[in-house]
Amino acid sequence: MTGEKASGGEAAGAPRRMLAQVLGHTLSVALHFLFAPRALWHGTAPMAEQRVYFANHASNGDFAIVWAVLPHALRRRTRPVAAADYWRGLIRRFVARDVFNAVLIERRREKRSEDPVEQMSVAIHEGATLLIFPEGGRSQGGVLPFKTGLYHLARLHPGVPLVPVWIDNLNRVLPKGEIVPVPLLCTVTFGAPIHLGDGEAKDAFLTRARDALLATRPTDEDCDGATEAEAAA
């Protein structure tokens, strides 16, 4: 009887999974068409290893763009960490959970039933790669000081590489309040991995991680090289 129930549950979930796959493919195609995002891999490569990607945050579309530029095999195992309050409602929650497989975090302490670091740590224990935004909110210029979550993940999972990711131009491609994209090149640059050093203090690590993210920003030569490489391909 138990086997029959499990089989029935799997059958009932099949249409939902199929819809999520179709919608995920459609979103990927749409994001590439609208924003033409390009991935630059500097100091690392798109490898099938568990990682924590940590990125700057200037737009609501940031994690979708990073998700879109990852190779399909890496995309399937990468879980973005996102604010639960933004992904409320039936459709948004379906997209977040079923399409992006996001780890949804409550930003307001009084509404939390789970510790955010514990939620992320469980996902890592389950084999997921995470995409997080350590600033904790969108910045309109520069990079805000990092919250402590990245440090706690580095301490709990010292063997997992932490890869800085710089998202460039997305806030200008689709300015706040606009619905028509501006034709600018959007790049996603992946930098050299870092780890928590032995005995490294929290503040020192967070400063070093922030500096690593800033150092990942692409130069004009990097973008020109990516354009030439794509044209040659």
Model-derived features: positions:
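Compositionally biased, charge-rich terminal segments
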Residues: M1-L19, A84
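Helix-to-loop junction immediately C-terminal to a conserved catalytic motif
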Residues: L19-A20, G24-H57
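Catalytic core of membrane glycerolipid acyltransferases/transacylases, capturing the structured
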Residues: M47-R108
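Residue-level preference for the first positions of well-ordered beta-strands
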Residues: Q50-V52, T129-F133, V163
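A cross-family acyltransferase "interaction/gating" segment
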Residues: F94, T129, Q140-D203
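Internal catalytic-core helix/loop-beta-alpha segment
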Residues: A102-V143
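A charged, well-structured terminal subsegment
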Residues: V117-E118, V122, T189-L214, D220
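Short, flexible loop/turn segments with low-complexity composition
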Residues: T219-A233
